[in-house]
Structure formats: structure tokens, C-alpha cells
Amino acid sequence: MAITRLLLRLIATATVTAGVAVVSTAPATQAQPPNFPDLKAFTDAPANLHFSRPVRWASGYAFFRTPDGVNCMMGSVTRCTGSLPGLPPGEYGACATVLQTYEEETRSLPFRFEASSEDCGPTTDDPLGVGQKLTFTTNYATTCVVGEGRLTACIQNEHGFVLQPSGSWVF
């Protein structure tokens, strides 16, 4: 009887300890820079949407499109491609990209804009609607939001970007 109680007490202690370990490994709240949209003002994307693709290489990513036709991918490479608002079209072309690659040597670098000489292709990815956010934590915790007035913003750890007609920026 005493052994049974001792075993039950050990199991209970191990369960509580395991629970604390899980909680302590949860991602910390991402620090948002000034003028970054308030993530709490957006609602989670509907659970019935599938922000994935069936091809094998895409299993570690989430994909979505915005109402204004920007195509985004979240994962070890996070990027959005399209007619990005707030960028000079003569400098970046009709299909610009904002991205960050999460390779070992670039982990501490901010996102960047890249020009493209090609037109953007169509996408069938599920839409992320105005007022919605999508958080993807498979590789690196990334949250993207879509707001009114062609606003798209993503944050991944201490880096991210804001796309908006009044001026897009990266950090």
C-alpha cells in the first residue's frame, strides 16, 4: 500500500514537472516594433481553411494569398511575392518579393526586398482575409496579418515586414 502511494506521488510529480517543461518551452511573445500592427486586433484564420500544399517539399510551410493578390509562404523561408504596395515599381518591377531565409548564416538578418523581372503567376492558395491572422510554428514562430487598405504584415522573432501603400518597410 505504501509503495503504491509512493508510486502515485512520483507519477504525479513527474506529470506536473513535464507540464511545467512544456509551458516553459512555449515561444515567447514577439516584440513588435513601433508602427507594427497590433496582433491582438486580428482574429485567427478559420480552422477549416488549409494553408498547406500536397507536394512533399511544402510540408514545412504554410501558404496564403491576400485579397489584393500577394502570395505568401511561411516556414524556414518566409516571403511574400506580388505587386507589393508602397514600393517604387520602377525599382522592384511588377512582381517584387519581401523575404528572409532562415539559413544558419542569415538568422540575425532582417527581411529584405528583391526585384523581379518576371510577372507574378496566379495562385490557388487559401485567402487570409482582412482582419485575420495566421500563426505558423513548425520551423520558426511566424505570425502574418492582413488588414484594411492593402496592409500585410509578418513578424518572425525580432524581424519582419509591413506592406502598405503609404510605404512598405522591413526590420
Give the role of each language-model region.
Residues 115-152:
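Acidic, glycine-rich flexible loop segments
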Residues 32-54, 76-130, 161-171:
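A low-complexity, Ser/Thr/Gly/Pro-enriched, surface-exposed linker/loop concept
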Residues 1-31:
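Secretory targeting and sorting signals
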Residues 140-171:
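Extracellularly exposed regions in secreted/surface proteins, prominently low-complexity, repeat-rich
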Residues 62-65, 80, 134-136, 153-156:
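Generic recognition of long tandem-repeat/solenoid scaffolds
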Residues 48-59, 64, 135-138:
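A cross-kingdom feature marking solvent-exposed beta-strand/loop segments within repeated
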Residues 59-86:
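Short, surface-exposed binding/anchoring microloops in extracellular/periplasmic proteins
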